[in-house]
């Protein structure tokens, strides 16, 4: 019932992902959400985000930001990291996930999406057919519509955790 929303992987933070291992597994394109995935909502790129994208470029990844925000927000975040981006993405629509892969020159088999929301980020990636990693939100302060979605996400994540326990038995 809820499995269409289950992430492929679920980790505590973008910053704990083993990107070298992803590269070894054959992934070449990384698509990122911004707010509460890389920085707190509305924040500019911080030193940690800048260092991450420097590292990802050195590994050999193509990177693209995909955000439901308007261009000024995305452009402000992207200025110090200088990767491709898609704004006003209408996630979970698949159109701009595909556009991000087209920009990077990757496809469903070698792209990974990283985001903090099940009903926009993960569901859009799953509908597009790409691997996805759900991360816990960086900061608890969020817009009201996101707060409401978080309650529903807790229900889905409960069933996700139960499904993982059943697999281990």
Q: What are the language-model segments listed below?
A:
Residues 2-32, 42-43, 47-62, 66-169:
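Asp-based, Mg2+/Mn2+-dependent phosphohydrolase catalytic module
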């Amino acid at each position: 019932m809820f499995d269409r929303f289950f992430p492929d992987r679920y980790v505590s933070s973008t910053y704990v992902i083993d990107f070298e291992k992803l590269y070894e597994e054959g992934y070449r394109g990384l698509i990122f959400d911004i707010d509460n995935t890389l920085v707190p909502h509305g924040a500019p790129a911080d030193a940690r985000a800048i260092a991450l994208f420097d590292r990802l470029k050195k590994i050999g990844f193509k990177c693209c930001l995909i955000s439901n925000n308007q261009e000024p927000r995305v452009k402000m975040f992207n200025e110090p990291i200088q990767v491709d981006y898609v704004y006003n993405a209408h996630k979970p629509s698949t159109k701009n996930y595909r556009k991000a892969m087209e920009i990077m020159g990757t496809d469903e088999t070698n792209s990974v999406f990283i985001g903090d929301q099940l009903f926009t980020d993960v569901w859009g990636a799953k509908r597009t057919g790409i691997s996805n990693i759900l991360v816990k939100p960086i900061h608890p302060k969020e817009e009201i519509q996101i707060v409401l979605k978080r309650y529903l996400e807790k229900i889905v994540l409960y069933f996700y955790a139960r499904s993982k326990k059943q697999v281990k038995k």
